Amino acid sequence: LIIPSLPEPCLPNINNTYNLVVTGIGGTGVVTIGALLAMAAYLDGKGAGMMEMAGLAQKGGAVHIHCRISKKPEDINAIRVATSEADAVIGGDLVTTAGSRILSLMQNGRSKAVVNGHETITGEFTRDSKFSIPSDQLLLAIEAKIGSNSVKFHDFSELSRKMLGDSIYANIMILGAAWQNGMVPLSMAALKRAIELNGTNVESNIKAFQL
């Protein structure tokens, strides 16, 4: 699989802080995405702070990460992203992203999102054989909040499985898609170096980021 080099998108400006929210399922590398963002910011000479907002990221449970990036470390006071202050949402899980807690962080005219449209059933719902995810309603809820032009949906889990043989790379694909759409104020060089420093499945993760 030969991946052509990506053109550098027009990166977003950082006014005070640039606020990212990463959602997903515990055990799928959500916390790793937050750590990669923070490390890449450091490598780019910027300030960064991240925190996990769902207690322990237990396997199979919903989790979300708040990450603030600033031009200088001293510009970051609080790490928690406040209501209507998310600049970008990296949505690794549709149900979590369309939940009221995450929607409250978004604002029409400010927030943009890339969301995995794959249907992942979490927690107690896995024990209910009749339960199905109202995907269309969840997609519409996000579009209603920030506008259809500000959100991109794709089944990144299936794409990851098809292209790289495992859905575990879906979250890094979503990060790559967000970066390619000008939603992450960090250089490609810093993000790739952060993936290398993380040291896990480096080649596959870089491919996933670039797809």
What are these regions (language model features)?
Residues 1-23, 28-211:
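Active-site cofactor/cluster-binding pocket
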